[in-house]
From Swiss-Prot:
GO terms for cellular component: plasma membrane; proton-transporting ATP synthase complex. It is found in: Cell inner membrane. One of its GO terms (molecular function) is proton-transporting ATP synthase activity, rotational mechanism. The gene is atpB. It holds the Pfam family ATP-synt_A. It is a multi-pass membrane protein. F-type ATPases have 2 components, CF(1) - the catalytic core - and CF(0) - the membrane proton channel. CF(1) has five subunits: alpha(3), beta(3), gamma(1), delta(1), epsilon(1). CF(0) has three main subunits: a(1), b(2) and c(9-12). The alpha and beta chains form an alternating ring which encloses part of the gamma chain. CF(1) is attached to CF(0) by a central stalk formed by the gamma and epsilon chains, while a peripheral stalk is formed by the delta and b chains. This is ATP synthase subunit a. Belongs to the ATPase A chain family. It comes from Teredinibacter turnerae (strain ATCC 39867 / T7901).
Length: 311
């Protein structure tokens, strides 16, 4: 695609940053076709977006098909290999994939034991699942940026098809995972502390006056509630945006390097060297971001189980 004569470098970059979007265009929306024809919709219409402007016009009533599809596919891949190893597990020394899975499970279990000091059988499997899934989604960033989009265009017969293959470069995916972690955090908080204990945690920390100065709490409780609520909401936002920002930046660098192939043979050769060098460095980003997301998820689960001293 980088060498296409119909695309400028700006068009190329914009095209690679746009998701395949299915959604509802409002009645009265004017669709501009490639042949110059303009079609005004008479009714609200569910359709695939042909341009970035159409995707934006769909607003909240839209689904990023590529993000959803690749996310589900990679989750199934992780589940398949985990189940295959579990079914074939024996008391003998593990080899091949089984050895790698054992190394992964033992390593993450060690991290969970260091961070999570409570009893909950769900947390370690959750951490393993989160790390494996996020790592696989991040790993898609190492596939050359044009390969899968071009294959999708050939199969579909649509040379303008949008097709992003790295789910974690879509903030909808990363924030969606972060919100799920946030909901689990709230669930375990209420489960472990009770609804009243959870409310007290929001209103009686970090500042609380002794009983003989109870009247100061009339001021401190609203202040505490604002501070704790902001801190609580910031957790999923920072968790999701951290993963998105790092992977999006890495993907953008790959795309910018790929534009060198359209300039000429010399720049194409330079681009190949840069692609390889950045891919090697980006492996660390892929691993670290999956690890950080997993560790923070475990930390948030530990915070949900922690009990503050009663006043």
């Amino acid at each position: 695609m980088a060498s296409s004569e119909t695309l400028t470098i700006t068009d190329y970059i914009t095209h690679h940053l746009q998701n395949m979007t299915y959604g509802k265009l409002p009645a009265g929306y004017a669709r501009h076709h490639a042949d110059g024809e303009v079609h005004v919709l008479e009714h609200d219409t569910w359709t695939m977006a042909h341009t970035a402007e159409e995707a934006a016009a769909m607003g909240f009533n839209a689904v990023h098909v590529d993000t959803l599809g690749w996310g589900i596919f990679l989750a199934l891949v992780v589940g398949f290999f985990m189940r295959r190893v579990a079914v074939k597990a024996t008391t003998d020394t593990p080899r091949g994939m089984a050895s790698f899975i054992e190394f992964l499970v033992e390593g993450i279990n060690g991290v969970v034991k260091d961070v999570f000091h409570h009893k909950n059988r769900l947390v370690a499997p959750m951490a393993i699942t989160v790390f494996s899934w996020v790592f696989m989604m991040n790993l898609m960033d190492l596939i050359p940026v044009d390969w899968l989009p071009m294959a999708a265009q050939i199969v579909s017969g649509n040379e303008h098809l949008f097709f992003k293959v790295v789910p974690t470069t879509d903030p909808n995916a990363t924030l969606g995972m972060a919100v799920t972690v946030f909901i689990l955090m709230l669930f375990f908080s209420v489960q472990q502390k009770g609804l009243w204990g959870f409310i007290k945690e929001l209103t009686c920390h970090p500042f609380f006056a002794p009983r003989k100065f109870w009247y100061f709490n009339l001021i401190l409780i609203p202040f505490n509630f604002i501070l704790e609520t902001v801190a609580l909401i910031a957790k999923p936002i920072s968790l999701g945006l951290r993963l998105f920002g790092n992977l999006y930046a890495g993907e953008m660098i790959f795309i910018l390097i790929a534009t060198l192939f359209s300039v000429g043979l010399l720049f194409g050769f330079l681009g190949g060297i840069l692609q390889f060098g950045w891919a090697v460095l980006h492996i660390l980003v892929i691993l670290i971001q999956a690890f950080v997301f997993m560790v923070l998820t475990t930390v948030y689960m530990a915070m949900a189980h922690d009990r503050h001293d009663e006043h």
